[in-house]
Amino acid sequence: MRKMKRLLAAGLATIMACSMLTGCGSGSSDKKASSDKDSSKGSVYYLNFKPEADEQWQELAKEYTDETGVPVTVVTAAANQYETTLKSEMGKSEAPTLFQVNGPVGLASWKDYCYDLTGSDILNELTSDKFELKNGDEIAGVGYCTETYGLIYNKALLKKAGYTQDDIKSFADLKKVAEDITKRKDELGFSAFTSAGMDGSSDWRFKTHLANLPIYYEYQKDGITDTKAIKGTYLDNYRNIWDLYINNGTCDAKQLSKKTGDDAVAEFTTEQAVFYQNGTWAYGDIADVGDDNLGMLPIYIGAPGEEKQGLCTGTENYWCVNKNASKEDIQATLDFMNWCVTSEEGTKMMCGADGMGFVIPFKNNLESENPLVNIANDYMEKGYTPVDWTFSTMPSEQWKNDLGSALTTYAADQTDANWKLVQTAFVDEWAKEAAAATK
């Protein structure tokens, strides 16, 4: 498992054990991948969003500095602390020259800091202009990776339980299989799902990624791509899949508040569970299971037409350049971005299975060595409809945190009254946070 050695805590005060989109550890990521600054060449300061990719970004920064002489500093924010850390760092005299937002909602907060990328070299490398993040007539950001998540599963364990992927085409099928495994878990020696940990290293999988499904289907039904007033049309479906996870997992649901992302990884890699909700970025943590033994299913919630549903594919990773940086630093940052997606060293680190394992929306994207990426591509080639990442329209981090807290309370005591807390967090708090964001 990949352990992060350099994590910058929120406000540079609190270090969190974390696993944002996969495994990580703790520490301070304020080490510089460069030495003395040559102001004539400019310099780069990248505030990285992904703790699980910290080590690779540090290596890539060093490689670029060794090759060009341009100093590159990479600082990695702790899981769930990026926005807080970005606010803190932007207030400093040497602020990040390269940062990221998650899409339109994030851009609304930082648009006044974004350099217009129109005419920059990196835009010429994109495979589609849909990865440009617009602010009016300006191009404020560029998506640098696409990722996919779903229900990763162990083929051998599923087969031992008497099933294959072909037996699971809907929520009803998944429920049948999971509950059957639970009934026979002592005989089989494993559970259906890894623990749905709700500590800060794991809760994003459910308050954000799982919550994406009911939002996506509501948007599809209403023919919209964003809203300031979510209705919660598919909240019953959200409850059904959450119930399935927490009542057919490796631990009692009352223990989930203290379960971590590392716990789930350990449970999956030691064959304690068949299913593990995560994405293509998790491959490095679970590779020991074996490429031929890894599968991935759509996350079914019982929505209409889900038999044609694919995996959840998208991006919430848009690079933005700080327009308040010096002219030299802006150019150095633009050059670094372009090098990352065009050079042999950059693309290998970004796309390779031994690197970050990204699929990048640029012409030099490499054929993936990550079997989970290939599974995602296979779903699309067979005509399944990818589930858009609608969580970039979630109104705020506070909304996610409130939803996560309500889910945790409900898991410990699964009553209708406690589910009402989830409904309130989902619907009422959405409207409240959306209204606050527009003030």
Q: Where are the predicted features?
A:
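A structural signal for short loop-to-beta-strand junctions that line the ligand-binding cleft
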Residues: 89, 96-97, 122-158, 189-191, ...
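Extracytoplasmic "Venus flytrap"/periplasmic binding protein-like
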Residues: 63-128, 156-162, 169, 267, ...
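Short, solvent-exposed loop/beta-turn-alpha elements that line the ligand-binding surface or hinge
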Residues: 116-130, 193, 197-200, 215-240, ...
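Glycine-centered hinge/linker elements that transmit conformational signals in sensory
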Residues: 178-179, 224-258
